[in-house]
Structures are given as C-alpha cells and as structure tokens.
From Swiss-Prot:
Protein's recorded name: Protein fem-1 homolog CG6966
Protein purpose: Substrate-recognition component of a Cul2-RING (CRL2) E3 ubiquitin-protein ligase complex of the DesCEND (destruction via C-end degrons) pathway, which recognizes a C-degron located at the extreme C terminus of target proteins, leading to their ubiquitination and degradation. The C-degron recognized by the DesCEND pathway is usually a motif of less than ten residues and can be present in full-length proteins, truncated proteins or proteolytically cleaved forms.
Quaternary assembly: Component of a CRL2 E3 ubiquitin-protein ligase complex, also named ECS (Elongin BC-CUL2/5-SOCS-box protein) complex.
GO CC aspect terms: ubiquitin ligase complex
Annotated organism of origin: Drosophila melanogaster
Lineage: Eukaryota, Metazoa, Ecdysozoa, Arthropoda, Hexapoda
Start-end of each TPR repeat: 245-279, 335-368
BP-aspect Gene Ontology terms: proteasome-mediated ubiquitin-dependent protein catabolic process; protein ubiquitination; regulation of ubiquitin-protein transferase activity
Gene Ontology molecular function, alphabetical: ubiquitin-like ligase-substrate adaptor activity
Ranges for region Disordered: 433-460
Length: 664
C-alpha cells in the first residue's frame, strides 16, 4: 500500500482522523518522508494550506515537524502555480488564521514562487486586505516584483482593490515604478477601469508615463473603453491637445468594435473633429489607403462624418484605420481588431473579406514583428482552422441565406507561402539565438535594458521600436514557438495536399504547392518529440482542427507529397520511431504503409523499445497486408543477421553503415 496517497488525500480533504491513523506508529523518518512526498506536484502541507484546513496544517507543523518552507504546485483559477510555498498558498486563498500560524512558525514572509510572486502579492491579487496588513506588519516587502516587474501596488490597482492600494500608498509604495514592459500602476488602473483608484494614484504623484508599447494611461483607457477614465484624464493640464484628440478618436474606435455602440462612437469622433478644428487647426496625418480596408480614407470633417451614419460597414473600416494610425501597425490591438473584424465577416458568410483582412494582418506582422511572434503564430493557426472549415463545409447553408463558398486554392497557397516563410525566419532566428548564447555579446547599456518611463503626449512616435523590444522579450523565452509554427505550416500544407489529385489545382499551381512543400521539408525542422513533417503526417495525434475530417491525420496525400519532395522515410524521433512505426500505432491506415514502403521505408527498423512494423501490427499477420519479400533488401537481411548474432562489426564495415545496422 502506498501511504503517501492516503496521507495526501487526508490532508487535501481535511480528514484529520485518517491522517493521524495513517501516521500512527510510523518512525520519524517514515513520517518525514510521507509528509514531504508530492502528489500531483503538491505536498500535504501545501495542499492543506491551499484548501484552508487549519487543523491539518497545525498537526503537520506541530506533531509531524513539516518543513514550513516546502514548496509545491497548486492551482488557482485554473492556472498552475509552480514552487508555491505554504504561506503563499494560504495568503492567495485568503486563510488569515493559517497565514498567522505559518508566520509564527518562522515562515519567510518574502518567499516566492517560481515566477517570483510573494505571499503579499498573492494577497493583493484577490483583495485579502487583512492578510496584506498582517504580512506587511511582519516584514513583507511590498516592493518585491514578480518576474514581469509587476509590483503589489500594480496588481492591487489592476484588480480594483481600493483599500489595498490606499494602504500601500500610505506606506510610500513607489507610485511610478515601471514593470519590465514599462507599464505603471496608473496604466494598470486605466486598463481595469477604476476611476476612484486612478484619482488616488494621481493624488499621490502618479505621472503619465509611456510603456514599451508606446501607450500612455490615457490611451490604455481608450483602448479598453473606459470612458469615465478618459473623460477625467483629458481634463488634466499635463495632457496635450493632440493627446486629447487621439484619446477621443481611439475611444470611438473601441466603441465601434468592442461595445458595438455606433452612436457613442460618432459622438466621440465628432468631438475629436471639433477639437481639431479649433484654431490653430490640427490636421490628421494622411494615411495611404489600404485595399483590405476597401480603400477607406479617414473622415476629416463633421460633414463627412454625418454622411457615414448610414453605412455601418464604413464605420467599422474607419475604426480600423484610426486605430492603425494612432497605435501603429506593431501594436497587438491593431492586428487583433483586424482579425476580429475578419472573424465577424466569416460569421456573416463573407469569407472573402475575412481572408483579405487576415492576410493583411499577417503580412503586417511578418513585416514588422520579430520571427515567431505569438501574434503571427495565432494568425497562422486561425487560417488553418478557417481553411479546414471552408473545405469541409463548402456548400452548407448559413444563417441569412448565405452559403459557405468553395475555397480559392490560390488564397490557401498564398498563406502557405507565408507559413513556410515564417518557419524559415523562425529557424534563422533560433539558430542566431543559439549562436548568441554560445558567444554572448557584451551587456547592453542600462538604458536599453530597462524601460524608459518619461512622460509623452503621443504613442505614435515610439510605438514601433518599443513594441519590437517587447516582442523580443516574449519570443526569447519560448522554446516551442518554432515547433508550433511548423505545425501550423504542416496543417495548411495538409489541406493543400488534399487538392493535389483533384481538378481544383492547375498543373502550374500543383507545381507551386510541391515547391512550397519542398522548401518546408528541406528546413528539417523538428516538432514535438523530435518528429519530422513526415512523422507528423503519419500520426493521428497531429490533428489540429479535429472537427473537420479533411484536416485529420494521418494524411495519405500529405505523406505522399512529402516523400515526393525528398522527405526521409527512415528518420527517427526521440523514441526511435520512423514514420512507419507511427503509421501503425493507431487504427491502421493501409495505404499509408504502402506509400511509405514504396518511398523507401525500411520494413524491419526497430525503435528504442525494440518494436518493428511487424510487431506493432500483431495479431494481424504482416503478409496479409504487404508482401514482405518486396520490401526486404539484402542489406536489411545482413544487418538483421549481424544484430541477431551479436557480431562485432566496428572496423570491419564502413563507419557510414553503423547507424543503418543499429536500426535493425
């Protein structure tokens, strides 16, 4: 019987009697081992602190001498928290009695989780005011920030906890401190919408600083649609005329897209135009018309604005144009709302407009953002899902009488080119990063390493360079970004390959598809479990959009196309599996094994578990599916004989054959 599960479950479920009975008559060594053992990443003490079981915690600390600083993994609001100390768990969950007990037992009030979150920050997050006061009184440092540079004051402001913010400010918490990405408590407050806390911060000397995205708190409030905060901030003497105008224009765009309040948007834009017309007039910066926006130009007069009232679609395009002018093409919200509008078009059955807008956003992302940006990855995944839907649902009647149109192969090919390009960019970027890690350059000057928090009236002048820095910080810490991008590219390639043997592709387009697959295959990028594109094509769990049958793996057409452009049928993954192994580890798809074998796959290759194609087929006899003699070479027979009889071959055969022999 494994007692650690009994002990853990008793602690988790507040079953003190069970816990005592299980540990009764156990030696101190056994008790120590059981109460420090982890189940699902957590110890009995950690889970009992998380769940608020006072008596269990007291028993573990006093009778069992549990280490008050042991850490574990717990979940809050569905998010896993790694390396959380007991005090952090109790503070986050709001269990004041347990917090006091732990502190009395010597718990470090400034202990941190893996992300450098302190118990005090955890209490600030969910508004546990009494715990905040208790921890500060016992030495908790309210200026310790998490790994993102986010302080206790910032999170209290973001979550709208007025009393905690007021208390921290009374202790002289740094009101203008910046996070890693340059935002301050005033930014967090503007984004969350608490006017009361905003006024409190301003009273304590908060300034209108600019973050790494080029955003002031005023623009942050406009983007999130908090009109009371915008109205308050534009009355401040430190806010320039241009900043007031930009805030009203951007807030109007938010009311169009986020709140769907056209009347309020028109009123805000009218106020902005009237402000521009005041002497001396402040004209808008002329923007080149964008085809994806249907060549819409920004209105420059109240008369033009009134004419737009009867055309909601033009108002929606106007919102996109305004947002791109003010925030710049690099801001996440610029791309987000382009894609948001495209999704609405798709819901209305206007798939051509959706593809046009999404393509524009993707082009913009690849032109400006760093390779493997999360936004670019998201765009590619969205295209894969959209194309899957359109291929499967073509001809289906939608609401409002529209029909899902057949997909245009050239649209899909254009996006596939962009996906392959992103993998190429990502691979070059990853290799460059690896080189930099091996040969680190000299440190950047301090001014380049930390955000500059200086007051500014507008985001437009600095947004491009600062946002690129922010995205570099994001991508540098995501080792799986290249793999995810490759998977999206494989998925779109799979959709295209399903059209290769149909009349949907002209000979020239087929040549282009195969050329793009060749470019993708020659990169030799590996995905999860060190698998190639061909591995992925042969394995059921590769499916991204499982709702649509044409997108499901294994894909015979994709495997065939990849073999045609030179994919290695004998490449092995981290478990020694070839594509042929994976093709057999599922409900068997007979044509796939024939295609792989015809493409040069070795019939008798063993994976690291000693499994072959034949053993994985069992109990089905192999000869009922294929002709083994047809796919067994003399070289394979020789290699198998060498391995079977454990014949020493080093120095006897060429070194180039060693790997081949070991595969058998």
């Amino acid at each position: 019987m494994d007692y650690k599960f009994i002990v853990f479950n008793a602690a988790r479920d507040n079953n003190l009697a069970q816990l005592k009975a299980t540990l009764y008559n156990k030696s101190s060594v056994e008790v120590g081992s059981l109460i420090s053992a982890k189940v699902n990443g957590a110890t009995p003490l950690v889970i009992s602190c998380r769940n608020g079981h006072y008596d269990i915690v007291e028993y573990l600390l006093t009778k069992c001498r549990a280490n008050v600083e042991q850490v574990g993994s717990v979940s809050f609001d569905g998010e896993p928290i790694e390396d959380a100390p007991p005090l952090w768990c109790a503070a986050a969950a709001g269990h004041l009695g347990i917090v006091k007990m732990l502190v009395r037992r010597g718990a470090n009030v400034n202990s941190t989780t893996r992300t450098n979150s302190t118990p005090l920050r955890a209490a600030c997050f969910d508004g546990h005011y009494e715990i905040v006061k208790y921890l500060v009184h016992h030495g908790a440092d309210f200026e310790v920030a998490n790994r993102h540079g986010h302080t206790c004051l910032m999170i209290a402001c973001y979550k709208g906890h007025f009393r905690i913010a007021q208390y921290l400010l009374s202790l002289n918490a740094d009101v203008n401190r910046c996070s890693v990405k340059g935002n301050t408590a005033l930014h967090d407050c503007a984004e969350s919408g608490s006017l009361q806390i905003l006024q409190l911060l301003l009273k304590h000397g908060a300034t209108m600083d600019v973050d790494y995205y080029g955003m002031t708190p005023l623009l942050a409030a406009s983007v999130t649609g908090h009109m009371p905060i915008v109205e308050h901030l534009i009355t401040l003497p430190c806010v320039s005329r241009e900043s007031r105008i930009h805030a009203l224009e951007l807030l109007g765009a938010t009311y169009v897209d986020r709140k769907r309040d056209m009347a309020a948007a028109l009123n805000l834009w009218r106020r902005a135009l009237e402000e521009r017309a005041v002497e001396p007039p402040l004209e808008k910066k002329v923007q080149e018309p964008v085809p994806a926006y249907e060549m819409v130009r920004e209105v420059t007069s109240v008369e033009e604005l009134e004419e737009m009232v009867l055309d909601p679609d033009e108002m929606r395009m106007q919102a996109l144009v305004i947002r791109q002018r003010i925030l710049g093409p690099t801001h996440p919200d610029t791309s987000y709302y382009i894609r948001f509008r495209g999704a609405h078009y798709a819901d209305a059955g206007r798939f051509d407009r959706c593809i046009e807008l999404w393509s524009y956003a993707l082009t913009m992302q690849q032109k400006i953002l760093q390779p493997l940006s999360p936004m670019t990855q998201s765009s590619l995944l969205s295209f894969a899902e959209l194309f899957s839907f359109m291929l499967v649902e073509a001809g289906r009647l939608l609401p409002r009488g529209r029909v899902v149109p057949p997909i245009e192969p050239d649209s899909m090919l254009t996006i596939f080119y962009k996906a392959v390009k992103e993998v190429e960019r990502g691979l070059a970027f990853t290799l460059e990063q690896q080189k930099d890690q091996q040969h680190p350059q000299k440190q950047l000057p301090a001014a380049d390493k930390s955000p500059s928090c200086s007051a500014s009236s507008s985001a437009s002048s600095s947004s491009s360079t600062t946002l690129l820095s922010a995205h570099q910080h994001d991508c540098n810490h995501d080792p799986n970004a290249l793999s995810r991008t490759m998977i999206s590219a494989i998925h779109i390639g799979c959709l295209l390959s399903s059209l290769l043997d149909t009349d949907a592709l002209s000979p020239e387009m087929r040549r282009q598809v195969m050329g793009a697959l060749y470019r993708l295959n020659r990169l030799k990028v590996r995905v999860r479990f060190d698998r190639t594109a061909l591995h992925y094509a042969c394995y059921r769990e590769g499916t991204l959009a499982g709702r649509y049958p044409s997108c499901q793996f294994p894909s015979v057409t994709l495997a065939k196309a990849l073999l045609e452009v030179g994919a290695d049928p004998n490449a092995i993954d981290e478990a020694g599996n070839t594509p042929l192994h994976l093709a057999t580890m599922q409900p068997y798809v007979e044509p796939l094994s024939h295609i792989l074998l015809e493409g040069g796959a070795h019939l008798d290759t063993k994976n690291y578990a000693g499994e072959t194609f034949e053993s994985l087929l069992a109990p089905t006899p192999m000869h009922k599916i294929i002709d083994p003699m047809k796919y067994t070479t003399l070289a394979c027979l020789a290699a198998r004989t060498i391995k079977k009889h454990d014949i020493r071959y080093e120095g006897t055969v060429p070194a180039t054959l060693y790997e081949f022999i070991e595969l058998h």
